[in-house]
């Protein structure tokens, strides 16, 4: 078996985010890392939308990111610390839309190791040096400079190592143009290591150490070190030089402290706490991330606590000495991994879990209503300030980037009966959790819908003048009339446009600079800007049946297949070409390309005929109306559309930006198939045809504009958009009802929209999320979803949600009541009334937990519930709240042989579980019956068990339960489940159970898979085979009777198969005792599984499923990851394909090595050598290589670049999208 890995949706969780002017213009961009992916985002200052410019797989783990700019430069570079053992500096090239590696310096081994630098990066604010540090011992400093040609240079590394030292954070100190300085939070563990009593470990203090790079001596010295009172978790650089006082802010538990060397005394301020918080009062509070905003006159910091509250931190200075720290509550947003304040007044927030946000900073929080806290205010030691959280006041949400991270569980099924299966994804953490339904398709925003007086058959938009940015008219054609609507604040009918209203229209367009042309069955109407009208009438009884128009040309087909060609002369007159062309058959459809910039005409006309052919005809004056090429089609054509796509940005001599792309002829057939063919711009030859089936109706094609480039809207029984995005072609269905006709639409509110008709309505639509694979509907949940099952009869989902360190609703209400009573009791006689009012206000206050976070209850506190939900409407049908400290870990739906036709839901629950060191107060299996037509859970009984039931699976009319490390069979009883059989030989903890026939496959938490046979006659469960590697399994999936796919905690997927000679029926030994006892526990079972597939995904996989994703497609193995990625592994069907992709992968490894310097082969073999899997992500980077590199690689494979691209596209569309 050989598999090919395709990513359908890249990871959506963000681990790092930095901002800067990476493209060298004034506009600020954001670079984010999503684990093994680098992405460049550009927030649009006008619309507030975040656009993705570039996404690149780096085939390595991005551990740290920093932006820097050389002194006096205008462009920011990106420094990346990764697991490659190399420091890499990247530059973004807007013309190629690529990151280019400028420097790559090797300093250590690959992998995420303790003493290999890469975990921490710090840059001198003036861009003169960069420090890269490991978590322990090693720190290296590189000097950055320019050479004579103004190119960036990098020095050899200077060491700043210190043995036996742990590093917590590193920043560059802003010292102006003095010698560059770096500040580190360190801890020396040498004494603690050598002291057996443990006293030294208890007394170890963290130190703040300053390292100075002496540029004159080319040497790093430890300038100064100071022990800290509190344990710090991160540092913030304070602007220095002419901008501020320099120094650092140390964020530690409950305090923020300003330090600088010299005479500066330490200034420290407690971190304010929420008033009347339900959290454990003993729990400290820390800042988790921060952002700095600096202008010429002032600077401030936004720092966020672990509850999500943001404080604005400012420093008061007196003669360059800092005198106080001031803090003011700013707003509360979900906890972030990184925040970026942009110069345009936006705040970009990459959330730890869930969606990412872009906020507009509406106010700087300078009003006096909000109390300001200061380090100068007198407080007792250990006391702090209190504030009242409130909804957003200073920030305004302007855009949201959907993120599935973390995906806890996923199932693929067609529960909505839509032909194409949907992905039901349980994702998120705590109160921000959601159940999302993903459908393949582009999300459509409906801008406007209006009724029309009848059923129109076509719609167009035209501009008044070629220079106009927006459209002026919408023309709607009916069977016997034409309606003209003007576009303004509202859409209104106009009568003086010059269009003939008493006839249907075949086509209309802007002609030349400012004239309009209307083609109708009896002639052509040329409307000049001063409303003069020229008309050309059809000769005799003939009528126009088809036409094609662009800015300068009109071609019409008369009855009988006669073509007449018109072209505009320099004076703006429309002239008929002297000859006419008789076609051999009736014309069904025609298309002209847009006139290329700087040219007189479009050279080619495409004509589709009844005889199942499409012909390319020249419009060049030298051979006008001469046939150039022809293509036979499998069915009759319905429509044609010539577009220029896949362009690269180029600047001409005048500095005008334009795109140079390829001409494609799109052919829509009557049998619902779309063909895309390359049209040679010189000879007019047709080559490299790609085919896709779109739907059951004939395909109509319309040219629209998307992101400044031409795209094609194809309409069949479903509408599809074909567009080029990040150097790849996408053909994506629209998640919208069937449309009949469309045209591009540009107005002030909607610059790249679509106007379309559906029955008797006119709709204006916008497609904003280009590049998105899925559109999603989200339903909120209360706690972190763990697992869910589908009720087969009603298609409802039974979902278990469990949170650690959380209170149940009942406990929260009880705690609130208790705190309110304490408030009243603590007040004196005269303040009783006021205290009672405050207590009542506190009880009524309801801050949504999805924004403000849930209270942290402390370790060993659990909250859990079972939810019955309708996945289509998203309404909760039934909800069972479990008691405080009961945690649901497994769920199954089954029928019992002795339980009739009823469906039962079994939920495995642990009581008083402590995670570390692991201990359990006991477990239960709750049994519910599904009643009320499938929308109610009726509690039957609970069965006590001695450990956590982490896995439950139905088995031959009974259930298999993994209780701790015991595998048991239970049957349904009146008062509880009855134990029937048990196996004690699983080493650690049963985490999953799969059954097929008499076989049971059990996954252990750290010892991979065990194959178990149930012997009915002896009532025994016997382990007869296991795996040779100790895998830490997270999820597994049956592929066939002998084959299992599984994924582990470290991001690997493997497929293991029992060898053909494996016997699970121990024939020679009728009692089965030999298999039970004839084995040492250390060597496991007597038979071993073979490894067929090993592959490192790079993200922890939490769900695997064998399924088909498209109607009529082949089966693939679909996986989802903790970071929000979705991918598939697809089998090769022929040796020839496998051989081709194996060679392509080999060439890509050498020709296009990964960005961060990690070796691709060793990345995919991180824990186990990669076996029998080809990396489609690497192969698909072929499309984004330089054309000459593409040519050399494809020549090595004895093919042309279009053939290689076609192979890549074909294998993708055969299984997915």
From Swiss-Prot:
- Offer one example of a GO biological process linked to this entry: mRNA splicing, via spliceosome
Q: Name the keywords, alphabetized.
A: mRNA processing, mRNA splicing, Nucleus, Spliceosome
Q: Which Pfam families match?
A: Beta-prop_RSE1_1st (PF10433), Beta-prop_RSE1_2nd (PF23726), CPSF_A (PF03178)
Predominant location category: nucleus
Keyword Nucleus appears in the UniProt entry: yes
Listed under GO cellular component are: nucleus; U2 snRNP; U2-type precatalytic spliceosome; U2-type spliceosomal complex
Would the keyword Nucleus turn up in this protein's UniProt record? yes
Q: Where in the cell does this protein reside?
A: Nucleus
- The domain of life is Eukaryota
Gene Ontology molecular function: U2 snRNA binding
Family, per the entry? Belongs to the RSE1 family.
PANTHER family given for it?
DNA REPAIR/RNA PROCESSING CPSF FAMILY (PTHR10644)
The domain section of the record reads: The core of the protein consists of three beta-propeller domains.
What is the role of this chain? Component of the 17S U2 SnRNP complex of the spliceosome, a large ribonucleoprotein complex that removes introns from transcribed pre-mRNAs. The 17S U2 SnRNP complex (1) directly participates in early spliceosome assembly and (2) mediates recognition of the intron branch site during pre-mRNA splicing by promoting the selection of the pre-mRNA branch-site adenosine, the nucleophile for the first step of splicing.
Subunit structure comment from the entry? Component of the 17S U2 SnRNP complex, a ribonucleoprotein complex that contains small nuclear RNA (snRNA) U2 and a number of specific proteins. Part of the SF3B subcomplex of the 17S U2 SnRNP complex. SF3B associates with the splicing subcomplex SF3A and a 12S RNA unit to form the U2 small nuclear ribonucleoproteins complex (U2 snRNP). Component of the minor (U12-type spliceosome) spliceosome.
**What is the protein's name according to its record?**
Splicing factor 3B subunit 3
Its taxonomic path starts at: Eukaryota, Metazoa, Chordata, Craniata, Vertebrata
């Amino acid at each position: 078996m050989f598999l090919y890995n395709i990513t359908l949706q890249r990871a959506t969780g963000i681990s790092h985010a930095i901002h800067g002017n990476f493209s060298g213009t004034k506009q600020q961009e954001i670079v984010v890392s999503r684990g093994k992916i680098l992405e460049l985002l550009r927030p649009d200052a006008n619309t507030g939308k975040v656009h993705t410019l570039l996404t690149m797989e780096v085939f390595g783990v991005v551990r740290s990111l920093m932006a820097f700019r050389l002194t006096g430069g205008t462009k920011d570079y990106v420094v990346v610390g990764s697991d490659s053992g190399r420091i890499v500096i990247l530059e973004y090239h807007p013309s190629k839309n690529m990151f280019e590696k400028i420097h790559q310096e090797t300093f250590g081994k690959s992998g995420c190791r303790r003493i290999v630098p890469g975990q921490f990066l710090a840059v001198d604010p003036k861009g003169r040096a960069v420090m890269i540090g490991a978590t322990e011992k090693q720190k290296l400093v590189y000097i950055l400079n320019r050479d004579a040609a103004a190119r960036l240079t990098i020095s050899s590394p200077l060491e700043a190592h210190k043995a036996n030292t742990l590093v917590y954070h590193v920043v560059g100190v802003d010292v102006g143009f003095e010698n560059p300085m770096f500040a580190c939070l360190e801890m020396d563990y040498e004494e603690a290591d050598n002291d057996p009593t443990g006293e030294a470990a208890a007394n170890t203090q963290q130190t703040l150490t300053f390292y100075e790079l002496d540029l004159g001596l080319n040497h790093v010295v430890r300038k100064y070190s100071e022990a800290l009172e509190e344990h710090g978790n991160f540092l913030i650089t304070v602007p220095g030089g002419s901008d501020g006082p320099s120094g650092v802010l140390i964020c530690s538990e409950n305090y923020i402290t300003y330090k600088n060397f010299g005479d500066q005394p330490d200034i420290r301020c407690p971190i304010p706490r929420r008033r009347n918080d339900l959290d454990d009062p003993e729990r400290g509070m820390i800042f988790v991330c921060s952002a700095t905003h600096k202008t010429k006159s002032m600077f401030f910091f936004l720092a966020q606590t672990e509850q999500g509250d943001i404080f604005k931190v400012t420093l008061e200075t007196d003669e360059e000495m800092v005198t106080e720290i001031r803090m003011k509550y700013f707003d509360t947003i979900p906890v972030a991994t990184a925040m970026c304040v942009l110069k345009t007044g936006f705040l970009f927030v990459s959330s730890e879990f869930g969606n990412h946000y872009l906020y507009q900073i509406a106010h700087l929080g300078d009003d006096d209503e909000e109390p300001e806290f200061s380090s100068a205010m007198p407080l007792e030691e250990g006391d702090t300030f209190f504030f009242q959280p409130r909804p957003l006041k200073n920030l305004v949400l302007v855009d949201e980037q959907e993120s599935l991270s973390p995906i806890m569980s996923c199932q693929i099924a067609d529960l909505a009966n839509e032909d194409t299966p949907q992905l039901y994804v349980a994702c998120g953490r705590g109160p921000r959790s959601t159940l999302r339904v993903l459908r393949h398709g582009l999300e459509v925003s409906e801008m406007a819908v209006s009724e029309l007086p009848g059923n129109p058959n076509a719609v167009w938009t035209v501009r008044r003048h070629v220079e106009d940015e927006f459209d002026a008219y919408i023309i709607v054609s009916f069977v016997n009339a034409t309606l003209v609507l003007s576009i303004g604040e509202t859409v209104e009918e106009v009568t003086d446009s010059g269009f003939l209203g008493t006839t249907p229209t075949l086509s209309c367009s802007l002609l030349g600079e400012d004239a309009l042309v209307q083609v109708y069955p009896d002639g052509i109407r040329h409307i000049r800007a001063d409303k003069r009208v020229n008309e050309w009438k059809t000769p005799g009884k003939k009528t126009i049946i088809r036409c094609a128009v662009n800015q300068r040309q009109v071609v019409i087909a008369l009855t009988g297949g006669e073509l007449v060609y018109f072209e505009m002369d320099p004076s703006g007159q429309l002239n008929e070409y002297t000859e006419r062309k008789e076609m051999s058959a009736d014309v069904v459809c025609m298309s002209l390309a847009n006139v290329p910039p700087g040219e007189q005409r479009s050279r080619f006309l495409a004509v589709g005929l009844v005889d199942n052919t499409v012909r390319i005809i020249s419009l060049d004056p030298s051979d006008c109306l001469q046939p150039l090429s022809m293509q036979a089609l499998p069915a009759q054509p319905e429509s044609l559309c010539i577009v220029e796509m896949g362009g690269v940005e180029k600047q001409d001599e005048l500095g005008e930006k334009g795109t140079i792309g390829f001409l494609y002829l799109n052919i829509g057939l009557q049998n619902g198939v779309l063909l895309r063919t390359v049209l040679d711009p010189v000879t007019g030859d047709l080559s490299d045809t790609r085919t896709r089936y779109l739907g059951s109706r004939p395909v109509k094609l319309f040219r629209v504009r998307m992101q400044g480039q031409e795209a094609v809207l194809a309409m069949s029984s479903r509408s599809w958009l074909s567009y080029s995005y990040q150097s790849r072609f996408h053909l994506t269905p629209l998640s919208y009802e069937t449309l009949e006709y469309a045209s591009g639409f540009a107005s002030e509110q909607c610059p790249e929209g679509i106007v379309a008709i559906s029955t008797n309505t006119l709709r204006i639509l916008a497609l904003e999320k280009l590049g998105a694979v899925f559109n999603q509907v989200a339903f909120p949940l209360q706690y972190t979803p763990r697992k869910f099952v589908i009720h087969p009869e009603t298609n409802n989902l039974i979902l278990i949600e469990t949170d650690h360190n959380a209170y149940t609703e009942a406990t929260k209400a009880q705690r609130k009541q208790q705190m309110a009573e304490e408030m009243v009791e603590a007040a004196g006689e005269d303040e009783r009334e006021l205290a009672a009012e405050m207590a009542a206000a506190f009880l009524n206050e309801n801050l949504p937990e999805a924004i403000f976070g849930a209270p942290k209850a402390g370790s060993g506190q659990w909250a859990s519930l079972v939810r019955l939900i309708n996945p289509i409407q998203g309404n909760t049908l039934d909800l069972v709240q479990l008691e405080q400290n009961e945690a649901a870990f497994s769920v199954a739906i089954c029928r019992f042989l002795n339980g009739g036709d009823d469906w039962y839901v079994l939920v495995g629950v642990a009581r008083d579980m402590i995670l570390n060191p692991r201990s359990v107060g006991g477990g239960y299996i709750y049994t519910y019956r599904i009643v009320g037509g499938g929308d109610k859970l009726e509690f039957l009984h609970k069965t006590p068990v001695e450990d956590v039931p982490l896995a439950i699976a139905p088995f031959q009319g009974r259930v298999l339960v993994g209780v701790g490390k015991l595998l048991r069979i239970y049957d349904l009883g009146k008062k509880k489940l009855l134990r029937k059989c048990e196996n004690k030989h699983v080493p650690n903890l049963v985490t999953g159970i799969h059954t097929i026939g008499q076989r049971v496959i059990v996954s252990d938490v750290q010892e991979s898979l065990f194959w178990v046979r149930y012997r009915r006659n002896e009532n025994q469960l016997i382990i007869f085979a296991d795996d040779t590697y100790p895998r830490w399994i997270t999820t597994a999936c049956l592929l066939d009777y002998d084959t299992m796919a599984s994924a582990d905690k470290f991001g690997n997927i493997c497929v293991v198969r029992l060898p053909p000679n494996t016997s699970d029926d121990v024939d020679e030994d009728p009692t089965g005792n030999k298999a039970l006892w004839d084995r040492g526990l250390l060597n496991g079972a007597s038979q071993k599984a073979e490894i067929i597939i090993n592959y490192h995904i790079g993200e922890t996989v939490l769900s695997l499923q064998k399924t088909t994703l498209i109607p009529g497609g082949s089966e693939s193995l679909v996986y989802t990851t903790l970071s929000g990625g979705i991918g598939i592994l697809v089998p090769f069907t022929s040796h020839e394909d496998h051989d081709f992709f194996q060679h392509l992968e080999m060439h890509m490894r050498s020709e296009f090595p990964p960005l961060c310097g990690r070796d691709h082969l060793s990345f995919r073999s991180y824990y186990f050598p990669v076996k029998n899997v080809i990396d489609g992500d690497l192969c698909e980077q072929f499309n984004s290589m330089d054309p000459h590199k593409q040519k050399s690689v494809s020549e090595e494979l004895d093919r042309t670049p279009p053939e290689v691209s076609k192979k890549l596209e074909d294998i993708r569309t055969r299984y997915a999208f």
